[in-house]
Every structure is written in structure tokens, then in C-alpha cells.
A protein has these predicted regions:
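Conserved acidic donor-binding segment of nucleotide-sugar-dependent glycosyltransferases
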Residues: 318-319, 323-330, 339-344
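Aromatic "clamp/platform" in nucleotide-sugar-dependent glycosyltransferases that forms part
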Residues: 267, 286
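Glycosyltransferase donor-sugar binding loop
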Residues: 35-42, 206, 233-248
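Donor nucleotide-sugar binding/catalytic pocket of nucleotide-sugar-dependent glycosyltransferases
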Residues: 56-57, 142-192
Length: 377
């Protein structure tokens, strides 16, 4: 008889971008897979079904801070799980790990695994002091983790810093835990292309245009570099999240476009075409799980510039496939950009090294085998 597994994430977009390969591999291994998420459309339901899985809706909204609504959703998800009757539940990201794990326990699910893919904004450092709201959210998050994590049979982390900070620093008991080192990348989809150094060096930032992603450091460094090397290209791909308080403004973005510091095509679906055009992938983030975008850029043979913070530092061997710079440091980021411009002959080998690290460390097939074996323990 086929085993049933329910994968619970926050939003459908998360499933599409981060769980596709795992769902497909589970289906290949003859699991009956149910994908539980918020925000389905008829089109996204069809996509999930095309993978061989069954879409199921929940209403546990990622940004909702209403504890009463979250409590109601715990019991609604429990009801759905009782109907599905899965052998295994995998919860992913902050809210599902906290609330849906409790739902699974109340539903009597035999094996429950939680995957914490970064600790989130509450645990992310900031160049300026955080306000009362951020501190309160962190306090509540830790309190809720202390309730939910002991209900899990195993907790998975992407990097060792997240594990030590959450479990050891805050003294949270778990039955079992493991660091899996990233969710991986499909090496066939993200193919290697040798660096083109016949033209001017180009840099790319890919992600939401938020303070904690390092967008302001990227922009400031780009302006500094353009003062010395005006022909350098800086691409930015990503949307402004207008509902996020740390998002950059449209006015600021437009200033950099008007000043010809950056090239901004906005949100695009052909991301790989822009990565191919670029030499260096830049993510000056303040904290990550292990960024999938960086793994994809590595697979495509890009040099990586990133920060010395949890999650980001897992993607670079300093000087081998890129450079690690101090977090918040526009000056050092610009210096490394200039170094790569002035020593662009090094880009070919560094890009090749990125691909090799991706093959050895971030092959999604190997990582999924590990995850599936953990789920089936």
C-alpha cells in the first residue's frame, strides 16, 4: 500500500519555487503526496496535479499576526489531516512548522518532520536597532517554537548556525535534529555556461528588494563602482514588496534607474537568461537559510559575492568561487567588485569552481534522497 505524505507550506508560490523537485521525487518513489498551502488558483492546482500530487487549501496566512486566527487554523488543518490520513507530515517554513505541526500531532499522524529554512526576519541582524514590534515577534516565535518543536519527530535545518542559535541558545528541546545543507538545485535545468570575459564585467542581484536582502548595500556599491568603471552593468531582478516595511521605495529605485546605475527589467520569468548574461551573482543578505538563488547561480557557473552570515557563507569558499564580505559593508562589497573587474581573467576558473561545488554540495537529487530517507525513518 502506498504511503501518504502531506507537505504543508505557507503559500502556493513556495511550493512552486521550492518544493517542485521534492514532490516529483516523492511521487517517483510511489508516495501519495498532498500539497497543503494557502492561495491556490485553478491554474496552480493544475500545476500541482501535473506533478502527480493533490493540492489542498489552508488559510494560515504568512504575514497574519492574529493569534486567534492562527489557533482556528490549527484545528482546520487538523480536520483536513484527519480526512487525508497521511502516514507522514512534512511542515516547512516558520508558521507551518509552528502551527501545522501541532495540527498533525492533534490529528494523530505517526511521523511529523519540520524543516526550518531560515529563522526569519525576527532573527535577522540589522544595521539599525530594531523596534519593539520586531522584538515582540521574536519573543513570541521562540515561545511558540518551545511548544511546537517537541511535538516533531525530527527537525531539519539548512545551516548549523540556525540549529545552534535556536536549539542551544534558547534551550529548546527536540527529539532529533539534522542539518541538511540546502534544498538543492536541478543541475540539468540550471546548466553550466563558461564565463564570457570578452565584454565588461556584469553583476546581478536577484531577490525581493528588501533591506535584509542587502539591496541598499548592492545599490550603494554599484554607484561607487560606476564612478570608476562607468561601463559596468548592474542587473536587478525582483519585485518591490509594498506590504513589507523594509522594502525599498519605488522612488529610490527610479533614482538609480534614471542615474543609469542599474538595469531593472522588474519581475521576469526568464531569470536564467539574465543569469547567463552576468558574470557575478551578488547577495549581500543579512541572514539566510541557504539561498536557493545562489545555488542556482553557482550551478550556472557564476562567481558569488555574498556576506559572512548564516546561510550565505555556506555557498562560498572565499577566493575559490567568489568572496565573502562583512555584512552591511558597502565599502568592502565595492572593493571586491572592483577587484573582479580588474582581474576578470580569474572569473573563468572561479565560475567553474562554483559549478563543481554545486555538483558536490547542492545536487537536488542527492539532497532529496536524504530528505526522503529521513521522512521514512
Amino acid at each position: 500500500m502506498r504511503k501518504r505524505i502531506a507537505i504543508i507550506v505557507n503559500e502556493v508560490s513556495t511550493l512552486l519555487h521550492f518544493r517542485k523537485e521534492l514532490v516529483k521525487d516523492l511521487v517517483k518513489e510511489q508516495y501519495e503526496v498532498f500539497c497543503i498551502a494557502e492561495g491556490y488558483s485553478s491554474q496552480t492546482k493544475d500545476i500541482i496535479r501535473s506533478w502527480g500530487a493533490e493540492p489542498v487549501e489552508h488559510n494560515l496566512k504568512r504575514s497574519n499576526l492574529n493569534p486567534l486566527n492562527d489557533l482556528v487554523q490549527v484545528f482546520k488543518i487538523r480536520k483536513k489531516l484527519k480526512q487525508i490520513s497521511p502516514d507522514i507530515v512534512l511542515t516547512c517554513f516558520v508558521k507551518p512548522v509552528i502551527f501545522a505541526s501541532i495540527s498533525a500531532k492533534l490529528a494523530g499522524v505517526k511521523r511529523i518532520v519540520g524543516m526550518i529554512e531560515g529563522l526569519g526576519y525576527a532573527f535577522t541582524p540589522s544595521p539599525t536597532p530594531k523596534g519593539f514590534k520586531s522584538k515582540l515577534i521574536k519573543f513570541l516565535q521562540i515561545f511558540l517554537y518551545k511548544i511546537s518543536l517537541p511535538t516533531l519527530d525530527k527537525v531539519l535545518f539548512l545551516n548549523p548556525d540556525d540549529k545552534s542559535e535556536l536549539l542551544e541558545k534558547h534551550n529548546i528541546y527536540v527529539k532529533d535534529s539534522e542539518v541538511i545543507g540546502g534544498i538543492g538545485v536541478n543541475l540539468d535545468d540550471y546548466f553550466y555556461t563558461e564565463q564570457n570575459i570578452s565584454d565588461n564585467v556584469s553583476f546581478i542581484f536577484l531577490g525581493r528588494l528588501l533591506k535584509e536582502k542587502g539591496i541598499f548595500e548592492f545599490l550603494s556599491a554599484a554607484r561607487k563602482v560606476k564612478e570608476k568603471y562607468s561601463q559596468t552593468k548592474f542587473f536587478i531582478l525582483g519585485q518591490i514588496d509594498k506590504q513589507n516595511p523594509t522594502a525599498m521605495s519605488e522612488e529610490m529605485l527610479q533614482t538609480y534607474i534614471d542615474d543609469e546605475i542599474i538595469i531593472y527589467p522588474g519581475y521576469v520569468t526568464n531569470v536564467q537568461e539574465y543569469i547567463v548574461k552576468s558574470n557575478v551573482f551578488v547577495l549581500p543578505s543579512y541572514r539566510e537559510g541557504v539561498p536557493k538563488s545562489t545555488q542556482e547561480a553557482m550551478a550556472m557557473g557564476k562567481v558569488i559575492l555574498t556576506t559572512d552570515v548564516p546561510g550565505c557563507k555556506e555557498t562560498v569558499v572565499d577566493g575559490l568561487n567568489g568572496f565573502i564580505v562583512p555584512v552591511f559593508s558597502t565599502h568592502e562589497l565595492a572593493e571586491k567588485m572592483i577587484y573582479l573587474i580588474e582581474n576578470k581573467s580569474e572569473l573563468v576558473q572561479m565560475g567553474y569552481n562554483s559549478r563543481k561545488i554545486a555538483e558536490n554540495k547542492f545536487n537536488v537529487r542527492n539532497i532529496n534522497k536524504k530528505i526522503i530517507s529521513i521522512l521514512d525513518e
